[in-house]
């Protein structure tokens, strides 16, 4: 009976189902994880470029940033911080090198963001949005070649900086009331 009343799975839903496995999470939720399975997997490492970025520009930007000054006095980051973020490619961590990005692995991006967050929530948001909620990922998957060639280099360099807009109490989903 239930099969006759359930809606058919859409192509998008089927792709999501087929996209991968639960990997280690399945072991945890089994109630009796086989720790040897986890230990057999190689520990993820950074590329030389990623490690150099963490040791160099990430440390430098953390030293340059004063969260108290930015959030309570200036209500913005100093222009030298903005310029440094653009010059060192912080906005292009997920963008492929062929478009001017850094093409970092997710582990490197997460580590960069964790380190920056330890110093400044504002700076973390400014760098994090373009590398997560920004349009680069959408352009890479769904953009035309012309859109990618035009927009991705501008996003990677910081010439164009995307934003994330959340709706308010009188429009859209009213996120604060959820």
List where the protein language model places each region.
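Glycine-rich flavin
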Residues: 69-178
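Extended, charge-enriched "interface" segments that sit outside catalytic cores
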Residues: 1-76, 80
């Amino acid at each position: 009976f239930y099969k006759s009343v359930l809606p058919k799975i859409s192509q998008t839903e089927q792709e999501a189902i087929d996209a991968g496995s639960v990997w280690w999470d399945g072991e945890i939720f089994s109630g009796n994880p086989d720790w040897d399975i986890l230990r057999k997997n190689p520990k993820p490492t950074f590329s030389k470029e990623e490690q150099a970025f963490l040791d160099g520009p990430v440390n430098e930007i953390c030293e340059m940033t004063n969260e108290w000054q930015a959030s309570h006095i200036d209500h913005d980051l100093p222009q030298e911080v903005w310029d440094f973020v653009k010059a060192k490619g912080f906005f292009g961590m997920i963008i492929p090198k062929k478009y001017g990005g850094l093409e970092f692995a997710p582990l490197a991006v997460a580590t960069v963001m964790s380190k920056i967050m330890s110093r400044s929530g504002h700076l973390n948001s400014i760098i994090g949005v373009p590398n997560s909620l920004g349009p680069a990922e959408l352009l890479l998957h769904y953009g035309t070649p012309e859109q990618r060639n035009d927009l991705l280099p501008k996003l990677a360099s910081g010439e164009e900086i995307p934003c994330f807009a959340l709706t308010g109490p009188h429009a859209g989903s009213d996120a604060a009331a959820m």
